[in-house]
């Protein structure tokens, strides 16, 4: 069975089962070869796919020498380190944040009202006051907070907000414009989720990876 036949069968399944799918598309190389929308085609919140864009940008920053996987969180923000900080806090690296093994071992900053600052008006101060429960690097725990901290490390290293850095390194290269991006209470784009994109634009990053890092 070819890709188009599989796509058509999937569309039929979505329709027959009334599955909560807004849109679906497949691409071959740089071209979309099949696309179907079940709601109006518009930019939508891509939620945790945002993490893929931020981690890609961090990879670019590492290649450019702005960061290292061994860069320590506390070195990026020494002013946020509590006077009674745990030894383990100083062991958290960018590598741990990207692999969600920071050691906080809790799904922080994932509550529905986090964008309004409920309970955490300053994400950095909030996370630096959390207890590191296990040794960094020892345990996987899915948490948007790890992504948010990694994003802030990128901002600090690049000297600009995430939106600016990603526009220069990714969005403009993929003809994605300047996407709407939800921010934290202090105006920093949320690295854990919140970019708005159309389906076609959302697909582009996957195409880049499938094409070994090239676009057109």
Please name every model-derived segment.
Residues 66-104, 129, 157-197:
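Active-site helix/loop module of the DD-peptidase/beta-lactamase fold
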